[in-house]
Structures are given as structure tokens and as C-alpha cells.
From Swiss-Prot:
Name used for this protein in its record: Alanine- and arginine-rich domain-containing protein
Superkingdom of source: Eukaryota
Cleavable signal peptide: none
GO biological process, one term: response to testosterone
Organism: Homo sapiens
């Protein structure tokens, strides 16, 4: 396989791909990779490469900046989403705490009401006991006076 065979092979490949949509602009016309016969083509390629180098460098810088910007934006978005999720969890936690406090306050009010009812019942029972004691003491004193009265009053 000689240098001419290589060139013909490249020409066939590039011509075959130019018929495909979207592929023709990706392939340049075939050029030899190196100067086999000393006809000066290799210097042309080197000059073209040097001329294209600033354009490629500019393109590389633009792509790098665009990629870095996209990465920073994605990171920023993730940080914001994480912060929003943390804030939502904290809000939900505070909502749960407030609901628990409201339930405990309601129970405390109910217990306070029951405490007042029990205190009133206890006072009522105490008054009843005091009244029963007085009645009992009166009955005992009246019973103890009755036998003396019976002895003094013979009927």
C-alpha cells in the first residue's frame, strides 16, 4: 500500500460522508498528512495549523468558560434546593412543635378545670362532714341529757 492508496482511501471516506446530512461540514477535503515527495504541502499544513491555533484556543477558552458557568449554576441550584428543603423541614418541625404545644395547652386547661371541680367537691364533702359531726354531737348531747331528764322527771 503506497502513499497514493492512502490518499484515495481518505477521498472515498470523505466523499461517502458528505452525502450524509449533518456530516459534510465536519469533514474537510482530504489532504496528505505528510510531504512524501517534497512538494511543499507539509509547510502549508503547518501554516494552516498555526493560523487555526488562535481560533482553536479561543474556542477552547469559550467552551471552558461555558462549562464552568454551567457547573457553577448547577451547583448553585443544588445548594438553593438543599437550603429550601432544609428550611421546609425546619418549618415542618416547628409546625409539629407548635401543634404539640397547642395540644398540651388544651390538656392543661382541661386538667385545671378538673382540678377546680375536684376542689369544689372536696369543699362540699368537708362541709357535709362538718355538718354531720355537729348533728352527731347534738344528738349525743341530747341523748346524754335525756337520761338525766328522765331521772329528774318521773312520769
Amino acid at each position: 500500500m503506497g502513499p497514493g492508496d492512502f490518499r484515495r482511501c481518505r477521498e472515498r471516506i470523505s466523499q461517502g460522508l458528505q452525502g450524509l446530512p449533518g456530516r459534510a461540514e465536519l469533514w474537510f477535503p482530504p489532504r496528505p498528512a505528510c510531504d512524501f515527495f517534497g512538494d511543499g504541502r507539509s509547510t502549508d499544513i503547518q501554516e494552516e495549523a498555526l493560523a487555526a491555533s488562535p481560533l482553536l484556543e479561543d474556542l477552547r477558552r469559550r467552551l471552558t468558560r461555558a462549562f464552568q458557568w454551567a457547573v457553577q449554576r448547577a451547583i448553585s441550584r443544588r445548594v438553593q434546593e438543599a437550603a429550601a428543603a432544609a428550611a421546609a423541614r425546619e418549618e415542618q418541625s416547628w409546625t409539629g412543635v407548635e401543634a404539640t404545644l397547642a395540644r398540651l395547652r388544651a390538656e392543661l386547661v382541661e386538667m385545671h378545670f378538673q382540678n377546680h371541680q375536684l376542689a369544689r367537691t372536696l369543699l362540699d364533702l368537708n362541709m357535709k362532714v362538718q355538718q354531720l359531726k355537729k348533728e352527731y354531737e347534738l344528738e349525743i348531747t341530747s341523748d346524754s341529757q335525756s337520761p338525766k331528764d328522765d331521772a329528774a322527771n318521773p312520769e
